[in-house]
């Protein structure tokens, strides 16, 4: 008999790493300038600051280092006094003793509004340094192979269906030993404690090793990063080193990996560095929001693999500090959103108008969780004789993500959210709040909701496109560590991020596109662990009713009768548009060439299965923690 979601996540939380564990207390760093107040994380605001001075420890790659001392409790009691750990000044800015001009501040409702930079305690001196500022220290530091190693429940993935389209598709592999990746890379795979390939890796790696172009559709969290990094690193190691111009300050990478966001670029860079450890393949990252001179210094020291966002890469190309004429491998991660969210002109200019070798000469790999037909047509301009690979959605054939839709009026969303969070905390292990990701549509909405959650006793942080890179990295570290277990985010900011142990995704504002919904709920139920996705639906989401109903039916979820009625109403208009889903059940896309010419290869059928009931276990449906037991470790990105 199927147990409730609350039971499964509670059992898993006992065996999995405790993300909500209290962080080690950090000594308060005294600021030499009394006119600046120290930044205090949301869960500690209102507490009396510590007066004991002590040297601050060196920042680690995943350490959260607030200026105020960190308390062992998961929550900070709301007490009297200023939220920002300092008395308000007469000029209304909240700065102590000085008329500091805030930047990007917003007034308004929602618990006080206010942008991140309007917070008086957040000064540039308090921010984390650029993680890539000290290149010598980076090279000397050993790579931590266990950072993202959280354990995989492989039983949940045995029957995931896979489809391939195209001619002469290389056969899949079952073990890494079947692939000639080179001794150094194989050693790094062992260091990462990867046991066997994930479904997307079983197919994508042989296809890429064979030199074929690839369009791969697989859910975030299914191992896409390793699927394109392994063949790239192996190919660079086995090829003859190119002759680069001597005395030039221009960098000539052999591989280019593009991603839509800064955080995803940093994430890919960290993973690629692990895989390239002691191989002689140097990986460099370049993204906006960080000092460009630091990145230029890294590029001057040599680069084989360049991970970049489109905007920063265009800047480097226009400065003639990067040349693409030696690029042999081009990979686009989250390719559908890069082509759909305004990056298409930049991507076309980079690929077609700069000095990059043309398609057919270079090898191109496109990866994403969804590939609608219109995006496939656009992306096919960059590919030559490619193979289309579709890996079944995790959650469409296994009991991983329980989807729940509630009808909530716009005016009632906040009170309903509070009820969910209270129930989740009460049912969580040791009364701790499970990691919860709340999606909203606008940057202003993210700021307002974060402030409102804080004023109601919930430690929360937020991330969106107006944050500086340091602020976004700090917020992510605070969320991952459990210091602020509620993260309010917009789509773009959280795109493609690999955040382990997210127990609950709440669509506070539903997106306009069903593919965005698929990407959002993919933040939970990762690596074989169970998760819960809750959506707030009302009359404003009528266009999403039909595709949402179809998606839940495909996943064997219980569809509310009221949602079926809304779905029927929206069907009278003919449906279609962006929300007419391609690919049918279980896949984020289907090769559009099949519809054009009726062809298409075979592939691995896989089992099927389903969610197995879709119940929520009564009142415990919002229990804390994360599901799935510990299993064999593998290369999930």
Swiss-Prot record:
GO terms for molecular function: ATP binding; ATP hydrolysis activity; mRNA binding; RNA helicase activity. Pfam families: DEAD (PF00270), Helicase_C (PF00271). Its EC number is 3.6.4.13. A motif (DEAD box) lies at residues 333-336. Residues 10-28, 46-68 have a biased composition (Low complexity). Residues 416-567 form the Helicase C-terminal domain. The keyword ATP-binding applies. It catalyses: ATP + H2O = ADP + phosphate + H(+). Residues 1-68, 86-141, 570-610 are annotated as: Disordered. Residues 588-597 have a biased composition (Basic and acidic residues). A motif (Q motif) lies at residues 174-202. It is an enzyme of class 3 (hydrolase). Residues 104-116, 598-610 have a biased composition (Gly residues). Residues 205-389 form the Helicase ATP-binding domain. ATP binds at residues 218-225. GO terms for cellular component: nucleus. InterPro entries: DEAD/DEAH_box_helicase_dom (IPR011545), Ded1/Dbp1_DEADc (IPR044763), Helicase_ATP-bd (IPR014001), Helicase_C-like (IPR001650), P-loop_NTPase (IPR027417), RNA_helicase_DEAD_Q_motif (IPR014014). It comes from the Eukaryota. Belongs to the DEAD box helicase family. DDX3/DED1 subfamily. The Q motif is unique to and characteristic of the DEAD box family of RNA helicases and controls ATP binding and hydrolysis. This is DEAD-box ATP-dependent RNA helicase 37.
């Amino acid at each position: 008999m199927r147990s409730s979601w609350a039971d499964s996540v509670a059992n898993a939380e006992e065996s999995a790493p405790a993300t909500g564990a209290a962080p080690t207390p950090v000594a308060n760093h005294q600021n030499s300038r009394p006119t600046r107040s120290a930044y205090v994380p949301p869960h500690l605001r209102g507490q009396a600051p510590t007066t004991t001075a002590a040297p601050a420890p060196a920042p680690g790659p995943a350490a959260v280092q607030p200026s105020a001392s960190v308390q062992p409790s998961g929550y900070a009691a709301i007490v009297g006094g200023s939220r920002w750990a300092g008395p308000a000044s007469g000029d209304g800015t909240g700065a102590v003793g000085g008329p500091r001009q805030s930047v990007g501040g917003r007034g308004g409702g929602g618990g006080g509004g206010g942008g991140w930079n309007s917070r008086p305690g957040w000064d540039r001196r308090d921010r984390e340094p650029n993680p890539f500022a000290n290149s010598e220290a980076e090279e000397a530091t050993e790579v931590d192979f266990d950072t993202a190693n959280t354990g995989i429940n492989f039983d949940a993935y045995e029957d995931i269906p896979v489809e391939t389209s195209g001619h002469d598709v290389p056969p899949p592999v079952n073990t890494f030993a079947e692939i000639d990746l080179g001794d150094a890379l194989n050693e790094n795979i062992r260091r990462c404690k990867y046991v066997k390939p994930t479904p997307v890796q079983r197919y994508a790696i042989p296809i890429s090793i064979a030199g074929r172009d690839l369009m791969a559709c697989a859910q975030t969290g299914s191992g896409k990063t390793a699927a394109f990094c392994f063949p790239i690193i192996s190919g660079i190691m086995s090829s003859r080193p190119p002759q680069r111009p001597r005395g030039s300050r221009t960098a000539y990478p052999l591989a280019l990996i593009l991603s839509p966001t800064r955080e995803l670029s940093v994430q890919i860079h960290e993973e690629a560095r692990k895989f390239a450890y002691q191989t002689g393949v140097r990986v460099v990252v370049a993204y906006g929001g960080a000092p460009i001179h630091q990145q230029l210094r890294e590029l001057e020291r040599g680069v084989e693999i360049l991970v970049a966002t489109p905007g920063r890469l265009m800047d480097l190309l226009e400065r003639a500090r990067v040349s693409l004429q030696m690029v042999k491998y081009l990979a686009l991660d989250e390719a559908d959103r890069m082509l759909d969210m305004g990056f298409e002109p930049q991507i076309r200019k980079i690929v077609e108008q700069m000095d990059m070798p043309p398609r057919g000469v270079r090898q191109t790999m496109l990866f994403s969780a969804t590939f609608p037909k219109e995006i496939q047509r656009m992306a096919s301009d960059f590919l030559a004789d490619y193979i289309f690979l579709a890996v079944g959605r995790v959650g469409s054939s296994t009991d991983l993500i329980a989807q729940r839709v509630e009808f909530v009026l716009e005016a009632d969303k906040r009170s309903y959210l509070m009820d969910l969070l209270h129930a989740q905390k009460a049912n969580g292990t040791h009364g701790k709040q499970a990691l919860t990701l709340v999606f909203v549509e606008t940057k202003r909405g993210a700021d307002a909701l974060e402030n409102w959650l804080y004023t109601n006793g919930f430690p929360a942080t937020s991330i969106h496109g107006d944050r500086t890179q340091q602020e976004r990295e700090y917020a992510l570290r605070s969320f991952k560590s459990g210091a602020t277990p509620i993260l309010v985010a917009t789509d773009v900011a959280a795109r493609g991020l690999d955040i382990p142990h997210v127990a609950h995704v709440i669509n506070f504002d539903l997106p306009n596109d069903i593919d965005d919904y698929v990407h959002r709920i993919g933040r939970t139920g990762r690596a074989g662990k169970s998760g819960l996705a809750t959506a707030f639906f009302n009359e404003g989401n009528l266009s999403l009713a039909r595709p949402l109903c179809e998606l839940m039916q495909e996943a064997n979820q219980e569809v509310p009768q009221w949602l079926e009625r809304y779905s029927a109403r929206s069907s009278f208009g003919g449906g279609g548009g962006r929300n007419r889903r391609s690919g049918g059940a279980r896949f984020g896309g289907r090769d559009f060439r099949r519809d054009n010419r009726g062809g298409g290869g075979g592939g691995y059928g896989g089992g099927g299965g389903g969610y197995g009931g879709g119940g929520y276990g009564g009142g415990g449906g919002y229990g804390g923690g994360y599901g799935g037991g510990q299993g064999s470790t593998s290369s999930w990105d």
